[in-house]
Amino acid sequence: MLARQTPLHGDHSRQNQCPNSFGHCTSDKSIYDSAQRAGLIVRGSANGDVGTWIFYDTASQTLTLDRSRSGNIRFSNAFSKQHIVYMPLENGKLRLTVLVDRNSVEVFTGDGRTVITDLIFPAPDDNRVSVFADNGEATFSDMTITRLADPRAKQ
């Protein structure tokens, strides 16, 4: 479990290392009090150079999955770096469910009405999860990280 409630003020972030690259993260109530942009970074590197950013922009009312720094992205000029969806907040809150494994990220919101699915190519050691808020405050509450079973492991 990452945190029951994680308030962030100003330009700030918090980072936790996941035990492996398989994970399930839910944030039942992400409240964007005054932050211009807030979200989480999955499959991040220790130095912060690599990571897949999932964030909400309050001005444009959009949810973005940005994989422009998600590891090896130079294999094709057709590689799309960002996927952006219009997603108005409900009562100032956004509920996300994020599934992450070795090479994919799936983001569910709106009770499954909106889904973003992308492939990512980080190094095996890029296994950190961070939350951040830019230019204001955001609260991540009821946030949990659950380790999923490795499908290659013998049962």
Task: Kindly label every feature range from the protein language model.
Residues 1-155:
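Beta-rich accessory regions
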